[in-house]
């Protein structure tokens, strides 16, 4: 019996009890949940449903909990029910019901933990979206890991997710990048407002290989030629780095295309029709303050050129026209002002602002020998995705970036994350999977196969703890997806790995010496098979490998 099964049983019980007592069953929450109590002596699972319902239905919570406990105790799979405190319902499962989770996992295989909660939702998930003026920096790398994991997580809940990269190839920063390439190609100093680093020199050399005539062209043609080739080369490098990091996108949208295709003009025309733009001081303004922004925003500047927000407006409208129900933007720590701005833009088009979700990620630092690492060999003044992968590898890089809530700054200790020790969280989890894989190989050599026919024999305390943690996986995914918090998967996997290591130290899985195999051995093998599957499923969501040998 999974926690979800138990929660459904509790809900069904509540409906029966409320009806019998003439109380309003409509007061029941749509979703009933059960939780693991902090103190194992309080049972396997606990619920505060009686306290939630008491006031709503006009019943004493403690008395209501007693009524619920009386009926629950008669249900199959329930070993014991107790009422505690002001109305907590503490439940213990019998060994057979608790162990049924093993069958559930083995039958579901790679799909264990998946649900259809978000079926029918079309979600656009935009992340990284770094300017093509340099390699992906460490902050963008955090989004490359977290965004990809969030996309996988939402997909497990049934959503149709499109991962999208918005390619900012329009505006002043591209001009500065182009001027930097031209200066490097000419052997001149980097412009004061330009981009430095050996990558600029490398790309400039590649531009000259592709267009050796470029510097002899008239200035405007030279600028356009270098711009087009240089930006394409930079973006090719960015995509290659992301792919090697395990992050790929379904769609790449160019900001320049929003302007060239007339999308910006279309968006502004739509806003004129709604009356949500006005002219002032020779510029065109969007009434974002009417929709929660701190001030109105210029859309078309007094010189007739579109402001940056014009591209954002066109891009949002483009997403909605492609049929997305939810648009998630993952932005850096310096983009807090965009939250109100993007929601106001949605409202200005007549949409519910809730269609827009903005996640803000905090800073990332690398630490080596207790000191912050501040410089990169290639990019000069920032640490890049490639630097991090070179230092600790893809798996550790992804896991270290996903493991913390995005609203928390993180320091990545390079020595810790490159170590083969239990203090390294990704090693700890991967080692559990490798250990389980070795166990399966050793069992096969004995001629033993997992057997779910005697799961009721799994009655040891450490077996019970492991079974309960395995059973929590679907709820962990459900909660992590709803809160957009893939770090919860990391923390869960660490708990699961810990429960497995403690189980293995206390419960012998394979026969030793001349010992004959028993039903308990094969039942424990089945538990290990389920455990291994859940770890593999969790690591897959994170985009981290599940090694069979370490």
Swiss-Prot record:
One of its GO terms (molecular function) is arginine-tRNA ligase activity. A motif ('HIGH' region) lies at residues 130-140. Pfam families: Arg_tRNA_synt_N (PF03485), DALR_1 (PF05746), tRNA-synt_1d (PF00750). One of its GO terms (cellular component) is cytoplasm. It is found in: Cytoplasm. It comes from the Bacteria. PANTHER family: ARGININE--TRNA LIGASE, CYTOPLASMIC, ARGINYL-TRNA SYNTHETASE. Belongs to the class-I aminoacyl-tRNA synthetase family. HAMAP family: Arg_tRNA_synth. This is Arginine--tRNA ligase.
């Amino acid at each position: 019996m999974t926690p979800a099964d138990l929660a459904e049983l509790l809900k069904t019980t509540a409906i029966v009890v409320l009806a019998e007592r003439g109380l309003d069953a409509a007061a029941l929450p749509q979703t009933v949940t059960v939780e693991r109590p902090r103190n194992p002596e309080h049972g396997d699972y606990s619920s505060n449903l009686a306290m939630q319902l008491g006031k709503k239905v006009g019943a004493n919570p403690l008395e209501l909990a007693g009524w619920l406990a009386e009926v629950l105790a008669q249900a199959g799979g329930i070993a014991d029910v107790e009422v505690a405190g002001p109305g907590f319902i503490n439940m213990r499962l019998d060994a057979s019901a608790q162990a049924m989770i093993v069958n559930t996992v083995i039958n579901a295989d790679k799909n264990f933990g998946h649900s259809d909660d978000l079926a029918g939702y079309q979600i656009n998930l935009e992340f990284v979206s770094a300017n093509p003026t340099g390699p992906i920096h460490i902050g963008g790398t955090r989004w490359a890991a977290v965004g990809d994991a969030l996309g996988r997580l939402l997909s497990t809940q049934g959503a149709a997710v499109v991962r999208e990269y918005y390619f900012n190839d329009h505006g002043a920063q591209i001009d500065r990048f182009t001027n930097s390439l031209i200066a490097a190609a000419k052997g001149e100093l980097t412009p004061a407002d330009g981009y430095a680093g050996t990558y600029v020199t490398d790309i400039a050399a590649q531009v000259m290989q592709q267009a050796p005539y470029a510097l002899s062209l008239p200035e405007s043609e030279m600028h356009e030629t270098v711009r087009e080739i240089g930006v394409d080369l930079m973006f090719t490098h960015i995509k290659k780095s992301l792919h090697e990091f395990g992050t790929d996108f379904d769609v790449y949208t160019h900001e320049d295309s929003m302007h060239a295709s007339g999308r910006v003009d279309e968006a502004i025309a739509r806003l004129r029709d709604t009356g949500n733009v006005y002219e002032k001081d020779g510029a065109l303004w969007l009434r974002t303050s009417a929709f929660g922004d701190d001030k109105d925003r210029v859309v078309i500047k007094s010189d007739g050129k579109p402001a940056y927000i014009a591209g954002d407006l066109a891009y949002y409208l483009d997403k909605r026209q492609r049929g997305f129900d939810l648009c998630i933007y993952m932005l850096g720590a310096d983009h807090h002002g965009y939250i109100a701005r993007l929601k106001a833009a949605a409202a200005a088009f007549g949409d519910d602002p809730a269609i827009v979700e903005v996640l803000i990620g905090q800073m990332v630092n690398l630490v080596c020998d207790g000191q912050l690492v501040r410089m990169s060999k290639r990019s000069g003044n920032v640490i890049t995705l490639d630097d991090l992968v070179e230092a600790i590898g893809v798996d550790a890089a992804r896991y270290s970036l996903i493991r913390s809530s995005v609203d928390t700054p993180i320091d990545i200790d390079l020595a810790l994350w490159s170590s083969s020790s239990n203090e390294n969280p990704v090693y700890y989890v991967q080692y559990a999977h490798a250990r389980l894989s070795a166990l399966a190989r050793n069992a096969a050599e004995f001629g033993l196969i997992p057997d779910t026919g005697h799961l009721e024999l799994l009655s040891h305390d450490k077996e019970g703890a492991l079974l309960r943690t395995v059973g929590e996986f679907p709820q962990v995914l459900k909660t992590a997806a709803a809160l957009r918090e893939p770090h919860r998967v990391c923390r869960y996997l660490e708990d699961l790995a810990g429960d497995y290591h403690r189980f293995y130290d206390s419960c012998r899985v394979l026969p030793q010496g001349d010992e004959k195999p028993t039903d308990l051995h094969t039942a424990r093998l089945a538990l290990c098979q389920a455990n291994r599957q859940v770890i593999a499923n969790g690591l897959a969501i994170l985009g981290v490998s599940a090694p069979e040998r370490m």
